[in-house]
Amino acid sequence: MTTKRKIIGRLVPCRCFRGEEEIISVLDYSHCSLQQVPKEVFNFERTLEELYLDANQIEELPKQLFNCQALRKLSIPDNDLSNLPTTIASLVNLKELDISKNGVQEFPENIKCCKCLTIIEASVNPISKLPDGFTQLLNLTQLYLNDAFLEFLPANFGRLVKLRILELRENHLKTLPKSMHKLAQLERLDLGNNEFGELPEVLDQIQNLRELWMDNNALQVLPGSIGKLKMLVYLDMSKNRIETVDMDISGCEALEDLLLSSNMLQQLPDSIGLLKKLTTLKVDDNQLTMLPNTIGNLSLLEEFDCSCNELESLPSTIGYLHSLRTLAVDENFLPELPREIGSCKNVTVMSLRSNKLEFLPEEIGQMQKLRVLNLSDNRLKNLPFSFTKLKELAALWLSDNQSKALIPLQTEAHPETKQRVLTNYMFPQQPRGDEDFQSDSDSFNPTLWEEQRQQRMTVAFEFEDKKEDDENAGKVKDLSCQAPWERGQRGITLQPARLSGDCCTPWARCDQQIQDMPVPQNDPQLAWGCISGLQQERSMCTPLPVAAQSTTLPSLSGRQVEINLKRYPTPYPEDLKNMVKSVQNLVGKPSHGVRVENSNPTANTEQTVKEKYEHKWPVAPKEITVEDSFVHPANEMRIGELHPSLAETPLYPPKLVLLGKDKKESTDESEVDKTHCLNNSVSSGTYSDYSPSQASSGSSNTRVKVGSLQTTAKDAVHNSLWGNRIAPSFPQPLDSKPLLSQREAVPPGNIPQRPDRLPMSDTFTDNWTDGSHYDNTGFVAEETTAENANSNPLLSSKSRSTSSHGRRPLIRQDRIVGVPLELEQSTHRHTPETEVPPSNPWQNWTRTPSPFEDRTAFPSKLETTPTTSPLPERKEHIKESTEIPSPFSPGVPWEYHDSNPNRSLSNVFSQIHCRPESSKGVISISKSTERLSPLMKDIKSNKFKKSQSIDEIDIGTYKVYNIPLENYASGSDHLGSHERPDKMLGPEHGMSSMSRSQSVPMLDDEMLTYGSSKGPQQQKASMTKKVYQFDQSFNPQGSVEVKAEKRIPPPFQHNPEYVQQASKNIAKDLISPRAYRGYPPMEQMFSFSQPSVNEDAVVNAQFASQGARAGFLRRADSLVSATEMAMFRRVNEPHELPPTDRYGRPPYRGGLDRQSSVTVTESQFLKRNGRYEDEHPSYQEVKAQAGSFPVKNLTQRRPLSARSYSTESYGASQTRPVSARPTMAALLEKIPSDYNLGNYGDKPSDNSDLKTRPTPVKGEESCGKMPADWRQQLLRHIEARRLDRNAAYKHNTVNLGMLPYGGISAMHAGRSMTLNLQTKSKFDHQELPLQKTPSQQSNILDNGQEDVSPSGQWNPYPLGRRDVPPDTITKKAGSHIQTLMGSQSLQHRSREQQPYEGNINKVTIQQFQSPLPIQIPSSQATRGPQPGRCLIQTKGQRSMDGYPEQFCVRIEKNPGLGFSISGGISGQGNPFKPSDKGIFVTRVQPDGPASNLLQPGDKILQANGHSFVHMEHEKAVLLLKSFQNTVDLVIQRELTV
């Protein structure tokens, strides 16, 4: 406004003095929050020449505006225009038009009438094509169409002969029209981020071209024809797949900048020396083994970057580069430098990081202008004395964790040559790389790595008992596991943040840093404080000012403490690419199933390999080793890929993650320690600089189980990685609590059992370990409730943008299955052995948990989960479990469970049965590595789709603020039963810092308490919770202590209308879980088992509804920042609480109740599996909350052009925090329409619900915003309708097999099949209601369920088909399940608040009602046969349009099956979810046997008990053909609401 006034003031002097009115020619209304063009503009329509309306909210241009005939410049960028009116043709004098960052979908044909147009800026609009009339704008000189949806240009585009600048970045162009050769005046052409597979032929005919961008395409060759562009000055060919550069490139005589970064070059042509004017040459991140000698001819070269290659020597001619100022040769294999290097006297910055230098030439002292020299991660024993001549040297990096730029050097005599040399305590350097790399190469997952890299600031500490921590605080132990760290290496010194761009390889640095040398504990260098500081987990949580590198401190108790403090400044590009490359190479190698103890050796062996590749990307070999050791080699590799379980690590500063284990775990501690070391190393790898993917790798590793305890520890570590990932995902400080790592908790192995926290049963540990195998490694929050919050900021601080670049693809691929917070269950866990240990819920929902599970969500192979498990068979088991419930023996499918079926059961039940045992909140995130891998692929190909909007990417991080998650914690508990609390604990510790601090509401103190094994905490949790209130920026404004019973209402009121609005705004696409890709819904992410049925059930239940909401939030989280999610969740939760209270208050309603709760648990598991029934509601909640936030149009949310626009500027950017994390509103925009379903109520719990998505439960959530009664009514109504529709199937639906939790049900079945019957009997009355009219049924269910479960009403988070355990399971669980369910439901309630349970109950009841359930538990196959269709849909992981629901469909061959399939491992992919390698139905014969049962897009999860999740296409076809007449399919369908 001030600008406007200024201009008007300037142009309109007081009329008193002027006899006539001043001529107004310029009006500027920029940034005035206008919703329409001000009317006063029309007063000057005769004289107005320039009108600026930038950055307002104008949705349409009034007709009067086009009467301004004199208008020459019209600037309306960053508004809400959806179209350009045809009346624009009347602006015949218009010369400049700027409509960028709007929602304009096309130019009107008659824009051709604006003959004077010379500049058109229309970037960041969904323009799919240009009208023919556009080519008649013959005066056009500048055209900017970046970030549109153009797939082609008009054939006569060459008519625009006056074009000088043409920018078409970030479109979908594959070719250029041949007429473009007429653009003789074209000087700048930007074709970056398109889909060119080869250089367009027409390019070499545009002779006047001076600047050409072709980066981020799919070029494989740089043809010689480019040499015809004699005027070319700037050429960017980076991020393609170029393998060869033609000799004729030398024809570009004027070329000054040549960018070939991130390609696949193995050599450069000698003719490159003929580019005499070259000043910048970048060939980093390729596969060069040598440089041509002719490079010395580039006498004007000022910047030369050949980092991240495979160079073993530099040519001596490099001495001729007298103009060179910057030389980067990082991450190569140089054993020495040529003496001629001293002739490069103008070099000011030289980086030689991560090579194999053992000495430096004396001539280096001649480089008098050298100011920055990075020698970290080499093998130097000393420095030449000539270094004393470098008077301008300001920074000398000798290690990655160096705390000061310059460290004093002492003069010494060389022992052998007696020459004077310079040394200091950092010599001799220990190569970090060799050992570290080995392990990495095997289990290393590129995608995970990338994520981890982004996560590079994570710190994972494993502490034994606090006492031990305190005692050993100052001591650094070298563990054999620490091999990567070099036992003899000196203590770690924190190194300052890297110089501008130098990236330190995480491992090497860490290793080096962790050298024998004692670490000066008081040394300021240790930013975190002395290693002893490690003990102070909280302090550890504090962000490290220095660039912390992942360092592994031998943990005090012989555990390794891994601190990933390194912040690598370098963004994804080169390092990441290199890392990816290395990783890919590594991944290619089979992972060794190495023991943790062996991991060092493994690491070494792998390291060598890795070193080769990873030198540039040092991975924590340990990490791989860990994985390897836990997982079987071949599988391991895949597992790494599958590691998707690792949540993508947003690019947040790593948090300190405390990997805590119960004492029990410590029993295996030695092994565990090793494992931990490995894990830690893995973690460090995970946290390492380039560790974005690494983190996920680490997480994957976490899955690996060394021993149950080890696994736990490992899991803890991995989980910590997970947590880190997640934490980055959910940066928001959950509680005031410091990160778990910060917390006082001791390393899981070492952690003494706190009185509060009971050690998890070994079984649980085993289970936990199993859980770790799953992508969704549970994170068990250590008891320390308050610790996470502090570290959260670190996570949150991680720049989203960092991850956003490559992240999006990852996110898409990753689906974080709900991460339940498993309350660590104390000894109480040992509930009746009779109970079948539930399969790890994590497993279930994580990766392969349920055949119904969205495979896409867990693209990684089911094997992955099992692979991670100590037993290779595990994979198969899991698969089996997914395939057939029966395979789930009392735990076989879930190996760990199997180990301690009782325990796992007890874990689950113990939560129910013993509240004394506080549950540990564990977050389990499952990310399929494959999902992640796409990102890697993208990175590798250097191709980032611009379609990946930053928002979406941003979504990757969850910013979760302290949302009381007591309920969640409870939910976790149930999870815990599957996942070992220990494991969970480990992860939670490792991850806890993450989970807690990061974003998991479950990290709430109370939540944590639940999650933690502390009984007292549980109680405490039940009593009070801290709720954070967030400001508009979603920054926690403070925490409020809330009693468990009543939660503080979220800052925003639930506004059903608003929610609906939000949902409206949300684009389904955005919403799809894929869109949320990397992030599991918060609720799921934080599923908390209720600590104990009795104590916390009510509280938990109350919070459970919130939790459920949280779930949806989580999902939204993927899009929304954790804080926003938290806010939403809070908002939703409080409303839901009342219903929860109603239903939840009586947490222990009875067997039925429990069963329903079990159902809930299962549903949660299912959710974890990727069915987010709750999530959807959560989404809805999110939407509703979004309502509270300004919601931008999808278009607004569109990503900005990479170059031209800031991420924020576009659309949602306003609402979205700068971090690029999409705001709640943005998320809401992206929330799947499913969420709308949420509005109508979550009744789906009913069998009908089972059939239909429980999405209605979301409705309930919305209801949460409305009066509880309304919600119930709505839910009932919906349910009644569903019941009517699905009544026939309801009983059938109940089949466990049908339930997504098939695995779980199997587990339960294993535990006690009797439950089915019992349940059935218990549910009989409910059954009757089901039999009644649907509406009646729903009422009955509501009532009964209400009675039974605290959330009698359908909770906003209905149990997805997946969420709800199969009836069979429930019934099976019968008594146990009741207990289990009770506990789980309590947990669920706590997390979902009773409503969820209610939903579950209803669903369960429905399921129970159907007799099928019992069968189903026996085997999924069994369930399959049951009803023609078991709509046990569970929320699918896809959130986009609908909820993926799972159905059982029985087809009778006649003569064939009547449908066609596509997809599969080796198939050509499917048109529905290209990233999903599952088997999809592509065509259904209209009259065929499947015509009424299947529809295109259905994903086949099972057929007659055979899992189709990771199956070869041919095998699937053969199987289907080989079946007899009846084929029972378990399919997943995205139901649109």
From Swiss-Prot:
GO terms for cellular component: adherens junction; axon initial segment; basolateral plasma membrane; cytosol; extracellular region; postsynaptic density; specific granule lumen. InterPro entries: Leu-rich_rpt (IPR001611), Leu-rich_rpt_typical-subtyp (IPR003591), LRR_dom_sf (IPR032675), LRR_R13L4/SHOC2-like (IPR055414), PDZ (IPR001478), PDZ_sf (IPR036034), Synaptic_Scaffolding_LAP-MAGUK (IPR050614). Residues 677-709, 1332-1354 have a biased composition (Polar residues). One of its GO terms (biological process) is positive regulation of neuron projection development. SMART domains: LRR_BAC (SM00364), LRR_SD22 (SM00365), LRR_TYP (SM00369), PDZ (SM00228). Pfam families: LRR_14, LRR_8, PDZ. The modification Phosphothreonine is found at T831, T865. Keywords: Cytoplasm, Leucine-rich repeat, Methylation, Phosphoprotein, Repeat, Synapse. The modification Omega-N-methylarginine is found at R1149. The modification Phosphoserine is found at S439, S441, S443, S850, S869, S947, S949, S1118, S1233, S1335, S1439. Residues 790-804, 859-871 have a biased composition (Low complexity). This is Leucine-rich repeat-containing protein 7. It comes from Homo sapiens.
